[in-house]
């Protein structure tokens, strides 16, 4: 669980910014987006192969 403690004299905006940064770094948002819909294993393999092909260019 990602947690951010509000420091003394720290604004909520800056704490929220730190929280968003931690969430992004942990990969939680991308994981949520990936799990929004079911993806068949064959479609997952196809997508990963396509991404690897694009990286090799």
Swiss-Prot record:
Keywords: Ribonucleoprotein, Ribosomal protein. The keyword DNA-binding does not apply. GO terms for cellular component: ribonucleoprotein complex; ribosome. One of its GO terms (biological process) is translation. Residues 37-57 are annotated as: Disordered. InterPro entries: Ribosomal_bS21, Ribosomal_bS21_CS, Ribosomal_bS21_sf. The keyword Ribonucleoprotein applies. GO terms for molecular function: structural constituent of ribosome. Residues 43-57 have a biased composition (Basic residues). Gene3D superfamilies: Ribosomal protein S8 (1.20.5.1150). Belongs to the bacterial ribosomal protein bS21 family. This is Small ribosomal subunit protein bS21B. It comes from Gloeobacter violaceus (strain ATCC 29082 / PCC 7421).
């Amino acid at each position: 669980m990602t947690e951010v403690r509000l420091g003394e004299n720290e604004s909520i905006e800056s704490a929220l910014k730190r929280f968003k940064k931690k969430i992004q770094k942990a990969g939680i948002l991308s994981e949520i987006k990936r799990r929004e819909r079911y993806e068949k294993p064959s479609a997952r393999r196809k997508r990963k192969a396509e991404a690897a092909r694009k990286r090799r260019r």
